[in-house]
Every structure is written in structure tokens, then in C-alpha cells.
Amino acid sequence: MVSTATFFFFVYLTLFVVIGFFSSLFIIPLLGISFVFAIGVVSFGFCSNMSFKMAQLIYVRADAFLKKVLDKMALQTQPAQLQEPQEPLSTLRPVSNPTIPSPLRQTARPSKFVTEEDVIFEPVSAQSAIARSLETAANKAGNKFQLS
């Protein structure tokens, strides 16, 4: 006769083989599908990296081209003429004058309003920040570029 231990050994062996067979029916196709998706992830990552590198190259070249055009435009513009202020200089007070009260220092008298005497007037140049930056770019370029 067959002992009880041998009988249960063959029962467990049979169950293990049957369950392993049915699980392999699911695992092997799913493993193949995951392999296909992994190939897709790698290939799309490669394509994404290549398209980014190409776009970066296009951007750098376009930026360099636009900078050259801007330098040429800066060389062709006439320097801005400094205009005299409309008010005579005698009415303007220097900023460094310590006798002018500052509105920020008048915390002891909170009820006092800011008057014309409290405001510091400075002559303002007619040039804008863009015009100054173009002149700076033209000076740095050393007049290398000429439009033809």
C-alpha cells in the first residue's frame, strides 16, 4: 500500500503542476505584452529626446540670427539727440541736497500731506531703456556688422 505521506505528496505535486500550467497561460502572454510596451517606452523616449534636441538647435540658431539682425539694426540707428529739459535748470534741485525733507522720514507728523516742496525733481532723459540697450549693443559690437 501507499503511505499517506506519499499520497499527499502526489496530490500536492499534481496541484502545483496544474496551477503552474494555468498561470503560465496568463503570465507568458502578459510578459510578452509588457515587453512590447517596454520597447514602446524606450523608442518613444528616444524620439522625444531627438525632437527636443532638434528644437533646441533650431531655437539656438534662430536666437543667434535674431541677435545678429538686432545688432545690425542697432548699428544703423542714429544716436538719440539729448533734448534740453523744458524747465530751466535753476528750478531743479539736486537729489543729494540733505535739506530737502523726505516724505518717508516724516513719521513724526502723520497728518502732513506731501507738497511740492517734498518732491525731488530730476531731469529725465528722452531716451528709453530700449534705446539705451540698443546703443550699448552697438558699442559692444564694435560696428562689425553693416546692412547691405
Curated annotation (Swiss-Prot):
<feature type="compositionally biased region" description="Polar residues">
    <location>
        <begin position="93"/>
        <end position="109"/>
    </location>
</feature>
<dbReference type="Pfam" id="PF17062">
    <property type="entry name" value="Osw5"/>
</dbReference>
<feature type="region of interest" description="Disordered">
    <location>
        <begin position="80"/>
        <end position="110"/>
    </location>
</feature>
<feature type="topological domain" description="Cytoplasmic">
    <location>
        <begin position="51"/>
        <end position="148"/>
    </location>
</feature>
<keyword id="KW-0812">Transmembrane</keyword>
<keyword id="KW-0472">Membrane</keyword>
<feature type="transmembrane region" description="Helical">
    <location>
        <begin position="8"/>
        <end position="28"/>
    </location>
</feature>
<feature type="modified residue" description="Phosphoserine">
    <location>
        <position position="102"/>
    </location>
</feature>
<feature type="compositionally biased region" description="Low complexity">
    <location>
        <begin position="80"/>
        <end position="89"/>
    </location>
</feature>
<comment type="similarity">
    <text>Belongs to the OSW5 family.</text>
</comment>
<feature type="transmembrane region" description="Helical">
    <location>
        <begin position="30"/>
        <end position="50"/>
    </location>
</feature>
<dbReference type="GO" id="GO:0016020">
    <property type="term" value="C:membrane"/>
</dbReference>
<feature type="topological domain" description="Extracellular">
    <location>
        <position position="29"/>
    </location>
</feature>
<protein>
    <recommendedName>
        <fullName>Outer spore wall protein 5</fullName>
    </recommendedName>
</protein>
<dbReference type="GO" id="GO:0030435">
    <property type="term" value="P:sporulation resulting in formation of a cellular spore"/>
</dbReference>
<feature type="topological domain" description="Cytoplasmic">
    <location>
        <begin position="1"/>
        <end position="7"/>
    </location>
</feature>
<comment type="function">
    <text>Involved in spore wall assembly.</text>
</comment>
<keyword id="KW-1133">Transmembrane helix</keyword>
<keyword id="KW-0749">Sporulation</keyword>
<keyword id="KW-0597">Phosphoprotein</keyword>
<dbReference type="InterPro" id="IPR031430">
    <property type="entry name" value="Osw5"/>
</dbReference>
